[in-house]
Amino acid sequence: MRRVLAVAAMTLALAACKADQTALENLGAAQSFLAENARKPGVKTLPSGVQYEVVRAGPEGGRKPTARSLVKVHYEGRLISGEVFDSSYERGAPAVMRLDRLIPAWVEALQQMRPGDEWTLYVPPEQGYGEEGAGQIPPGAPLIFRIELIDVLPAPGRIQQG
């Protein structure tokens, strides 16, 4: 029994080391990718280090979301390898989400956008899923999102005025 427990403990320790190594490798790749990307024409950087490019600007005067807004968006998330890990386009329908429940990069960027805007975000790991990763997203991975803000919706239980 002790031998089984020792083997299990060693297996877990090795798996943790492998995840840490993967995160470190991805963090290095993220730094290189983002440093090079920042030099491209049209790429701007937000205070957090999230980079963005305006693909299409919507009409002026549209209402920007706040941190607690519900937003209707179409989006595609990719790794820097080009692998798509999530896409509302592939599902054939936009998503409605509460902004304060999203990754920090989305919260920051969407508050700068207006309905009709389409941006490409280049997300450092600490503004995405960090050293843990999530699902198909490896630990420490930089991310690329194409986001189209379709609408800012009234929060549930609130009366929209005007």
Predicted regions and their residues:
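Cross-family detector of peptidyl-prolyl cis-trans isomerase
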Residues: 2-162
